[in-house]
Amino acid sequence: MTEKDLVIYRRRLPHWRLDGSVYFVTWRLAPNQADLYAGERNELMSALKHFEGHRYELFAGVVMHDHVHVLVKPLGNQPLQAIIHSWKSFTAHKFRRDYGRTPPIWQDEYLDRIVRDEQEFLDKAQYVLNNPLKTWPELEDYPWVWVKEDLTP
């Protein structure tokens, strides 16, 4: 990696971009929003998987009651921010139309981190898989978590 390969920009939060990287990304519902309904979680999981293998490689994802975590690698010339924008925009419009939610649905910003090595990649995938158990320890099966079978960065 050279300095010219790494792009850093800032909105309210800093964002680092490095071509070919895997990112761990988190975004949340806006503060005025009630928890996601089961149908909304289904829609969001479907949206996350929709362009998998075309615009991005999705390694893991979980839709919680008020936030989302994904482990994702943009493909080709797809910018990470465009991928996240498409997920948030598509689901916000769908949630407004189908569930009567009023905007804003999602917080404007999101947290992203470049995954630096294979161990961190595996740790983040495990975090995604275990995230529902942190909130609901008695849970045996959570339908809104997904981890790719061939989990290699």
What name fits each language-model region?
Residues 1-153:
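Short catalytic/metal-binding and nucleic-acid-binding patches
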